[in-house]
């Protein structure tokens, strides 16, 4: 085995072939970091047949003018079951970054620690407890099992839906009642989905603005999304849910005809048997449905006059690789939230994964707090409704490469933090 630099082609071919390969360990992310002006390294291990068996994208940032801070975002991509390979990789990686004036090395591997349900109850161990001892022996310090959303650290909890050996019907069957109803609702109510181009990205950004204002969370800036759409190319998809009013109103009219037919039947039953309470209840229920149907038709016609035949209502931002589809961000028009457009977006992308043989649908980050007053309690409930599970990752590890200078650096940083 040998530790070596990799070409972008070698790196991409290997990371695309591996499980637990995060979108930040892809050629698209490498090209993005180059364009942003970061010092970037592609490194890995090749076996005696010159085949890549481990890979890692590193970025380096200047620290204290002379030194550099090296970071591998969700790397390396490696067979973690091969502990000998893991030891060799991190040992050689430390030597490599030391040659490049590294002050300290930071990694947050895409490696599960344990599994939980959406109530925060542990359902299983991932079998990677050995990794903590291994990293400690190699000189890495674990930063702890942090919860919540941090501006610097990667989120430690993901909500993930397993699609392996499942059909679309299986997915719907396993949803809770609300998710099931809304998914079926958007399928029949004229809600369509198409993919936005770069020129149309402001539509998505406007929805994100609506959502961030209503739910009080900090969104990324425009540059973040535009750059990833540009450099990730077909590894980013931005599905837009919209109402086609011609189809929507047509379907409502067809529904009205059926309801009127059923109502007339109920009225005839009452004429025949006036004492039949069941027929009276059925009549009342059908009349309520007809009233609601008429309101929807009137609303549809009004909105069609105001907005034209197509009305954008929701959009999402997704990362794609052979391992998983990642729901990174999404927003919905507050004015048209009742059309449940976000469910159309989710259903489109779940089916995208199924149709492309991708076994994992990642709803992405949750805080890991699992309380009613958690900042993401509503989001957790939404993701739970799809019958997803929580994966908790091992977290962050830091290795001081130049120990004396790193000790001085951290001491100085603590003083600054106290002052400011």
Swiss-Prot record:
GO terms for biological process: cell wall organization; peptidoglycan biosynthetic process; regulation of cell shape; response to antibiotic. Its EC number is 2.3.2.17. It holds the Pfam family FemAB. One of its GO terms (molecular function) is nucleotide binding. It catalyses: beta-D-GlcNAc-(1->4)-Mur2Ac(oyl-L-Ala-D-isoglutaminyl-L-Lys-(N(6)-Gly)-D-Ala-D-Ala)-di-trans,octa-cis-undecaprenyl diphosphate + 2 glycyl-tRNA(Gly) = MurNAc-L-Ala-D-isoglutaminyl-L-Lys-(N(6)-tri-Gly)-D-Ala-D-Ala-diphospho-di-trans,octa-cis-undecaprenyl-GlcNAc + 2 tRNA(Gly) + 2 H(+). It comes from the Bacteria. GO terms for cellular component: cytoplasm. InterPro entries: Acyl_CoA_acyltransferase, FEMABX, PG_Glycine_Bridge_Synth, tRNA-bd_arm. The keyword Cytoplasm applies. Keywords: Acyltransferase, Antibiotic resistance, Cell shape, Cell wall biogenesis/degradation, Cytoplasm, Peptidoglycan synthesis, Transferase. Gene3D superfamilies: 1.20.58.90, 3.40.630.30. The keyword Cell cycle does not apply. Disulfide bonds: none annotated. It is found in: Cytoplasm. Belongs to the FemABX family. Homodimer. Interacts with FemB. Catalyzes the formation of the pentaglycine interpeptide bridge, which is characteristic of the S.aureus peptidoglycan. Adds glycines 2 and 3 of the pentaglycine bridge, using glycyl-tRNA(Gly) as donor. Involved in resistance to methicillin. This is Aminoacyltransferase FemA. It comes from Staphylococcus aureus (strain N315).
């Amino acid at each position: 085995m040998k530790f070596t630099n990799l070409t972008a082609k070698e790196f991409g071919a290997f990371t695309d072939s591996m499980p637990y390969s995060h979108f930040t360990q892809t050629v698209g992310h490498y090209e993005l970091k180059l364009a942003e002006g970061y010092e970037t390294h592609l490194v890995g291990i090749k076996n005696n047949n010159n085949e890549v068996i481990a890979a890692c994208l590193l970025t380096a940032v200047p620290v204290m003018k002379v030194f550099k801070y090296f970071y591998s975002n969700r790397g390396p991509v490696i067979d973690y079951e091969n502990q000998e390979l893991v030891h060799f990789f991190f040992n050689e990686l430390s030597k490599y970054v030391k040659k490049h004036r590294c002050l300290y090395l930071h990694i947050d591997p895409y490696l599960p620690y344990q599994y939980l349900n959406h109530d925060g109850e542990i359902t299983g161990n991932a079998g990677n407890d050995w990794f903590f001892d291994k990293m400690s022996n190699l000189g890495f310090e674990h930063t702890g099992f942090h919860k919540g959303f941090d501006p610097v650290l990667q989120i430690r909890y993901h909500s993930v839906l397993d699609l392996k050996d499942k059909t679309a019907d299986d997915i719907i069957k396993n949803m809770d009642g609300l998710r099931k109803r809304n998914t079926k609702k958007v399928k029949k109510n004229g809600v369509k989905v198409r993919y936005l181009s770069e020129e149309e990205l402001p539509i998505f950004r406007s929805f994100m603005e609506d959502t961030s204002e209503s739910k009080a969370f900090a969104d990324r800036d425009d540059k973040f999304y535009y750059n990833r759409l540009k450099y990730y190319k077909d590894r980013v998809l931005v599905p837009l849910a919209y109402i086609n009013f011609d189809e929507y109103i047509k379907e409502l009219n067809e529904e009205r005809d059926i309801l009127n037919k059923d109502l007339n039947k109920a009225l005839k039953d009452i004429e025949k048997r006036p004492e039949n309470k069941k027929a009276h209840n059925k009549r009342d229920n059908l009349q309520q449905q007809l009233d609601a149907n008429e309101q929807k038709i009137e609303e549809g016609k009004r909105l069609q006059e105001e907005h034209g035949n197509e009305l954008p209502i929701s959009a999402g931002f997704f990362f794609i690789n052979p391992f998983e589809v990642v729901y990174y961000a999404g927003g919905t028009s507050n004015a048209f939230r009742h059309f449940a457009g976000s469910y159309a977006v989710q259903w489109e992308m779940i089916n995208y994964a199924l149709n492309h043989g991708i076994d994992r649908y990642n709803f992405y980050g949750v805080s890991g707090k699992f309380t009613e007053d958690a900042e993401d309690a509503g989001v957790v409930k939404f993701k739970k409704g799809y019958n997803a599970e929580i994966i908790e990752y091992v977290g962050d590890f830091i290795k001081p490469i130049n120990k004396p200078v790193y000790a001085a650096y951290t001491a100085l940083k603590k003083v600054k933090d106290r002052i400011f």
